[in-house]
Structure formats: structure tokens, C-alpha cells
Amino acid sequence: LHMKLHSFPTRRSSDLVFCLPPSIQPDIHPENIPLDILYEDRDVIIINKPKGMVVHPAAGHYSGTLVNALMYHCGEDLSGINGIMRPGIVHRIDMNTTGSIIVCKNDKAHNCIAEQLKEHSITRKYHAICYGVIKDDEGTINKPIGRHPTDRKKMAVNEKNGKEAITHYKVLKRFQNYTYIECQLETGRTHQI
């Protein structure tokens, strides 16, 4: 086995020691945040998530998330499949996207909805306003999306390290410098739209 440490080759008799800091699991608390509930029954709750709200706690966003609001609204009645940081969450939408999100209240519903998303029997459509005038009335964008090569906070088309991202679009209306479109996603990559 040929290895390097800090660009220097290691010797066959060398020992490599890894010191990993303990992972810190932040405390996630219920918060009384108003929810725009589109539908609710004993298995699922469908929320119209507003722009600016993060779906689940993550680095830099441990409060004010949809999960914090759901914990307050639903109490213990959320699927535990995705753990304490994502109770009930089957899919996500970006922080700056407004749209419907299905949340599962039990593991049976979670497995059922996850399978439907995987099999594409649930259709996800979004409306978006794009800068520029799109010439074709409809089309498909099939480009891999991954981290931007120089700005890790951004996503970009990344042929080398990106994951498959397929978006079908249909032009609804054209304006002088913008196009209003409907998008149907086959995949669900961060910042895909």
C-alpha cells in the first residue's frame, strides 16, 4: 500500500493515527412557528413551505426550520426513519424555494411515500421565472450538478463530480427579458431548478 501524509511518502512500517473530534449532536427543540397546512391526516401532513425557511436543522440553521415547527405542531407523531434531525422528512426543497412538502407522521407512510418518489409515481412540478428568453417551448435539461469548483456554498453544472440532474420544462409565458416556466423534476438535486 503506497500512501502519502502531507505530501510525503510513508514507510511500510509507519503507523497512521487519526484523531477525529467527537460529533456534536445539537439539541433540536419544538418552536411555535406558524405552518401553512394544505392537508393533514393521521399519516401525512402537506405544508406550503415559505421561501427563506430551511427544511431541517443543519450547520448554521438549528432553529426556525420546518422541523422545529413540525415538532411543535405534531409532537411525537413524526416518522423516525431519518433520525432526530429530520423527523418525518421524506424530501426537501431549497431554502429559497416556496412549495409543497410532504411530511410523514409514521414509518409506514414514510416508506410508502419514499417508494413513490423513487418510482416517480409522484410528480413534482415547480413554476419559476428565468432570466433571459428561452426559445424552445419545452425541453429537457440533463446535466450533472455538484459543488461549484471554487465556491463550496454554491452548486453548478459539474461534469466531473456532479450527480445526475434531469429537469423537464415547458414555457408558460415569455416576457422581454424573462421566461415563466413550469419544471418537472426527475431528480432532486440541491439548487436543481
Protein language model annotation of sequence segments:
Residues 176-184:
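Short histidine-centered loop motifs in beta-beta connectors
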Residues 7, 11-149:
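RNA pseudouridine synthases
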Residues 1-6:
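Short, exposed "boundary/linker" segments that immediately precede the start
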Residues 56-57, 104, 155-157, 181:
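Thr-Gly-centered strand-to-loop micro-motif
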